[in-house]
From Swiss-Prot:
GO biological process: glutaminyl-tRNAGln biosynthesis via transamidation; translation
Enzyme Commission no: 6.3.5.-
Alphabetized Gene3D superfamilies for the sequence: 1.10.10.410, GatB domain, N-terminal subdomain
Gene: gatB
Record-stated family: Belongs to the GatB/GatE family. GatB subfamily.
NCBIfam families: gatB, PRK05477.1-2, PRK05477.1-4
Source species of the chain: Roseiflexus sp. (strain RS-1)
A family per Pfam: GatB_Yqey
GO MF annotations in UniProt: asparaginyl-tRNA synthase (glutamine-hydrolyzing) activity; ATP binding; glutaminyl-tRNA synthase (glutamine-hydrolyzing) activity
Name recorded for this polypeptide: Aspartyl/glutamyl-tRNA(Asn/Gln) amidotransferase subunit B
Enzymatic reactions: L-glutamyl-tRNA(Gln) + L-glutamine + ATP + H2O = L-glutaminyl-tRNA(Gln) + L-glutamate + ADP + phosphate + H(+); L-aspartyl-tRNA(Asn) + L-glutamine + ATP + H2O = L-asparaginyl-tRNA(Asn) + L-glutamate + ADP + phosphate + 2 H(+)
InterPro entries in alphabetical order: Asn/Gln-tRNA_amidoTrfase_suB/E, Asn/Gln-tRNA_Trfase_suB/E_cat, Asn/Gln_amidotransferase, Asn/Gln_tRNA_amidoTrase-B-like, GatB, GatB_C_1, GatB_Yqey_C_2, Gln-tRNA_amidoTrfase_suB_CS
Entry function: Allows the formation of correctly charged Asn-tRNA(Asn) or Gln-tRNA(Gln) through the transamidation of misacylated Asp-tRNA(Asn) or Glu-tRNA(Gln) in organisms which lack either or both of asparaginyl-tRNA or glutaminyl-tRNA synthetases. The reaction takes place in the presence of glutamine and ATP through an activated phospho-Asp-tRNA(Asn) or phospho-Glu-tRNA(Gln).
Origin superkingdom: Bacteria
UniProt KW keywords: ATP-binding, Ligase, Nucleotide-binding, Protein biosynthesis
Amino acid sequence: MDYLVTIGLEIHAQILTRSKMFCGCSADYADAPPNTHVCPVCMGLPGALPTPNRRAIELAALTGLALNCRISHTNVISRKNYFYADLPSGYQRSQYDDPLCVDGWVEIEGDSGPKRIRLTRVHIEEDTGKLIHTNDGGSLVDFNRAGVPLMEIVSKPDISSPEEARRYFQKLRQILVWIGVNSGDMESGALRCDANVSVRPAGQQEYGAKVEIKNINSFRFVERALAYEIERQIRALKAGEPIVQSTRGWDEVSGTTVAQRTKEFAEDYRYFPEPDIPPLHLTDAWIDERRAELPELPDARRIRFIEEYGLTAYDAGVLTDERTVSDYYEQAVAAARTRGVMPKEVANWLTGEFFRLLKETGESPAHAAQRMRPEYIGEVQELLNNGVITRTSAKEAFEAAFREGRSPAVIVAERGLAVIGAGDALTDLVRQVIAGNPKVVEEYRRGKATAIKYLIGQVMKATRGQANPQAVQQALEQELAREQAAC
């Protein structure tokens, strides 16, 4: 029997603000000593009154616009009531009936081609504290994270496979980091995912029971957790066992999902409007201001790179994966064009040597770009195009410029990387190679045309790649002919 899989994701993304969602405490909790970025509001003390963070709301609205959502003019903050040790007030300020952003969609590469994943909502809420488990079986609570601004991005159940879920999660992360609303750091918990999945026999119209997998913090784990859970549910259905709506956790060590609790329903949280925060009313003018903040998004820029710069779809995709790289490429193209260097030539350096050196050094593109000025790329290519240096020397000059942050032209001059052209120096090297390889020379004279390639390689090796290969071949042929005539 065939089975249909239905998946929806809830992405929890911390909003990049200096202060928390409803108080003035610092939202930068990563390296702070436990419970030092706290106050009566985020500790949930009686009588403490919250104040919404304007910038957090602006960035959440910006996110909604980037995800093709409609921004609600009236927003209500609600209390989501439940008890857990990391929730000091006994409720979480969130949104229920009146979220900030509704509808929307994200386009991904689906299993059968381009596919739109529809969104239900994007709403704002506050993060919880963090439990720290000790070796003796106890648990401690750090409330520095409590109250940090958070967005929940909820998709409709449009995802059909674990692979699509991974691509959707990756696409969302790309957009959030691109527009500057989230760090994209999943290891620290700044971006995490809850996955809802149900399985039903093919032909059955009614969805199967929904199982939620909580707090997944990597693309690989999303795919693996869903693949396991789908297989678990199919095995249960084949055995005639019911699937119970529940919450499970992903155990990365065993590669399995683990039962945590029976799944709650919305009614269990007893949502009601936050009495200390009146409804937020957003005007059309305010929404237009947020729309004006929106940068060119990755998909639009990728298409423009193909059409304007003549890049392949692959190169355009690579160069729009991160905004830092994409902006750097455009700066490099603008500088290179003044030297007659083509955008494709700039792209080749970035997707080749630049990325190789980033991987080798472990640097971020933003850090490397501060040293490797964008105009250096066109400078290297111009020297290569004008025959001043060979491809080998160009790579050496590029790497030196990357590591040292100095002009490639200066490096070429200092290291003597300029091409060794026709002349006495090249002739002397050619004669040395001919004298040192009598067997190869004899093969060449017997008609083995490929033998000269070996001789060319030896000359290039002796010049450290600085000679022009065409000039080397011409010098070799002339010298071999001269020696032949002298015999």
